[in-house]
Amino acid sequence: MEAERRSQPGKPKKGRVCSNLLLERHPAAGTLTTMVDSSAPPSRKLPSAGVGRPRFSPQGGQRSRPHSRRRHRTTFSAVQLEQLESAFGRNQYPDIWARESLARDTGLSEARIQVWFQNRRAKQRKQERSLLQPLAHLSPATFSGFLPESPAGPYSYTTPPPPVTCFPHPYSHAFPSQPSTGSTFALPHQSEDWYPTLHPAPAGHLPCPPPPPMLPLSLEPSKSWN
């Protein structure tokens, strides 16, 4: 067996490679072999898949992003805008027949007119919100300062006063009435300002007017005593 193995010096052993270079440089190291698995396929580094590189289509051209649809803006003339604004003032939501009739008058397509009405309604809502936004911060007391004060309006309601009870004058029965004579002098009417201070009336009640002034006694000359 050993003779057969020696007779085939040029046939390397499977899975093992002898390193003669190390033996020549280091003879004292003895027989030194390195184990190399030659049956395993050589490893290769896979390239990174598309990192930082543009992608190419199978046809060979570079793949481009799908560009967005370009919007075409329609320019309206002054006559067309006047007709559209007039129709918008009459009806903000025209039907298909009204839009087709307006399209014949203005020379525009029905789709353009429909888009114009949508934009016009959105513009009007935005204007209304901008007008109402400053008024939302004002308090109700601020609004009352701008309103004119009227003494009595057609819808103003006032509370009726309490019923007035009339009390007799406290001095109306204190003095008996005396007959009037021809030679009497009428006293001037006294001021009634003193009456509420001397005789305050209860709350919700007013006193009766004072009685007529009493006539003084007769000023005839006294008869002599005979």
From Swiss-Prot:
Q: Which GO terms describe its biological process?
A: pituitary gland development
Which residue ranges carry the DNA-binding annotation? 69-128
Gene Ontology molecular functions: DNA-binding transcription factor activity, RNA polymerase II-specific; RNA polymerase II cis-regulatory region sequence-specific DNA binding
Q: Could you list the residue ranges that cross the membrane?
A: none
Task: State where composition is biased (Low complexity).
Answer: 216-226
Q: Where in the cell is it found?
A: Nucleus
Q: Which residues form a coiled coil?
A: none
Compositional bias (Polar residues) at which positions?
31-41
Q: Which residue ranges are recorded for the region named Disordered?
A: 29-73, 178-226
**UniProt xrefs under InterPro entries:** HD, Homeobox_CS, Homeodomain-like_sf, HTH_motif, PROP1
- Look up the record and report any one GO term of the cellular component aspect: transcription regulator complex
What keywords are annotated for this sequence in UniProt? DNA-binding, Homeobox, Nucleus
Q: What segments bear the compositional bias annotation Basic residues?
A: 64-73
Tell me the domain of life: Eukaryota
Annotated family: Belongs to the paired homeobox family.
Q: Do you know which PANTHER family this protein is assigned to?
A: HOMEOBOX PROTEIN PROPHET OF PIT-1
> Tell me, what does this protein do in biology?
Possibly involved in the ontogenesis of pituitary gonadotropes, as well as somatotropes, lactotropes and caudomedial thyrotropes.
Recorded protein name is: Homeobox protein prophet of Pit-1
